[in-house]
UniProtKB/Swiss-Prot annotation:
Disulfide bonds join 3-24, 17-42, 46-57. Keywords: Disulfide bond, Secreted, Toxin. This is Synergistic-type venom protein S2C4. It comes from Dendroaspis jamesoni kaimosae (Eastern Jameson's mamba). Expressed by the venom gland. InterPro entries: Snake_3FTx (IPR003571), Snake_toxin-like_sf (IPR045860), Snake_toxin_con_site (IPR018354), Toxin_cobra-type (IPR054131). The lineage of its organism: Eukaryota, Metazoa, Chordata, Craniata, Vertebrata.
């Protein structure tokens, strides 16, 4: 499985998931007007969202 770890104007960065990590996740929370803290990567289980954040998980490449 290959997950996106970062998106920018220059393209995307990806990582190959380790054995046992079969889910890609995107975790983001609002830090201010039009400002978000975003984390992406591989995981074994879908993480829970913080009170002021959101999480999206999938099990397909990129």
């Amino acid at each position: 499985l290959t997950c996106v770890t970062d998106k920018s104007f220059g393209g995307v960065n990806t990582e190959e998931c380790a054995a046992g990590q079969k889910i890609c996740f995107k975790n983001w929370k609002k830090m201010g007007p039009k400002l978000y803290d975003v984390k992406r990567g591989c995981t074994a289980t879908c993480p829970k969202a913080d009170d002021d954040g959101c999480v999206k998980c999938c099990n397909t490449d990129k």
